[in-house]
Amino acid sequence: MLKTICVKTNNKEISKYLLKELEYFEVQSIHVSSYKFKVYTNVIIHYKGKNIELFLNKISTLLAYLIIDFYEPSIIQNLINTNYFYFSTEEKKDIYNLCLTNIDFKTSISIINIISEAFYEYFFYNKYVVLDGFVNFRLKNYIKELDTVVDMCVNKFIIDREYNEFVSLLKAYIQTTPSNADAIHLIYKNQNSILLDNSKNAIQYNDILINSKYLSDISFSSNDYALNSLLTLLPKKLYIHLIDVEDDFISTLKRIFGNRVYICTECDLCALYKSQTSKYNLNRLKN
């Protein structure tokens, strides 16, 4: 049984890519030829085997990867320019780069399946395909998937921008405001903060320390009051005793307080709180 497919493109790089990939095509019994006309280059694949479904499946997957390599960047760029035209050129570039890095493995598999299924269904009833037209009119679900990725990345970009503005404002405030404490110790354990003064006595989060003007839309949940207290006290040195791993809150403190921050993981204070954690975990296992 003979099955013929003709792929039409006016992009030289696409035709070269397709011909090269077909040299290593996994399906036997195919003959490939290429003809250049005034508008399009036609890449023609003749299949003389018996397993038409396998042939269509493999050629559809090959074309799906081709679409991702050659069309996806411009589709993403067009979606950004159309839906988010009010961002600056530099901001659009940042959003575009975010999109490229945020298409994870799961999303990639989903996208490949969407495109290959569209080609598979199309080739059951058609012998030739114009790639530009196919992308514009037959891959609506694919473009919708990319639109979702762009929306997600725009939201992430806005949140990151607000976060960076927040950090910059606080850094400027710290640099222009006198310190109210020589040193503060912050014990960071189970994503919660305990503040100690220079004598290692506990600092209470009371109304005297809390100044609402330092509160921000950027929230660290239970650590908001710790951050506010630090912004009120403005220590010359901030010793962070990491009982657990460093997370976003600690990274933010390092950005805000800069060279005032000293990370510690092995002092007597660290050992004390680590031993308390170990005893707690041991008691939980016994119970």
Predicted regions and their residues:
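Conserved mixed alpha/beta catalytic, RNA-binding, or beta-rich assembly cores of soluble enzyme
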Residues: 1-224
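C-terminal structured domains
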Residues: 199-287
